Design a protein with these regions (language model features):
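Short acidic/glycine-rich loops and adjacent helix/strand connectors
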Residues: 1-106
Length: 106
């Protein structure tokens, strides 16, 4: 089974490709510098950065793994715990990818 996993629970956007329990790629985009001036994570800023970073991070993970979207068996996303607005970005994006590819959403 080849799985695309999306993670956006806080201030890092991550996409991983896993095949039969082996991680083929794990790409992470950090927002530490963005939030540093505020002394902590600002949920609205985190969500906006996820929107900006999710597609390139996902494309990078798939390319690194050498997997085409049609070769995926399922798409998954973090459902919690985390910042609600940040989780929503990854959850809905992963749902949309699964729907577009006609694959199960986990």
């Amino acid at each position: 089974m080849t799985l695309l996993a999306i993670e956006t629970s806080c201030d890092e956007t991550s996409a991983a490709v896993i095949r039969d329990g082996v991680v083929l790629a794990n790409v992470v985009s950090s927002q530490i510098k963005l939030h540093a001036e505020y002394g902590g994570v600002v949920p609205e800023l985190a969500a906006r950065e996820h929107l900006k970073n999710l597609l390139p991070v996902t494309q990078n993970a798939l390319a690194t793994a050498g997997v085409k979207p049609a070769e995926l068996d399922a798409v998954a996303a973090t459902q919690g715990p985390g910042l609600g607005i940040a989780l929503l970005v990854g959850f809905k994006a992963a749902q949309a990818m699964a729907y577009a590819l006609d694959k199960p959403f986990l």
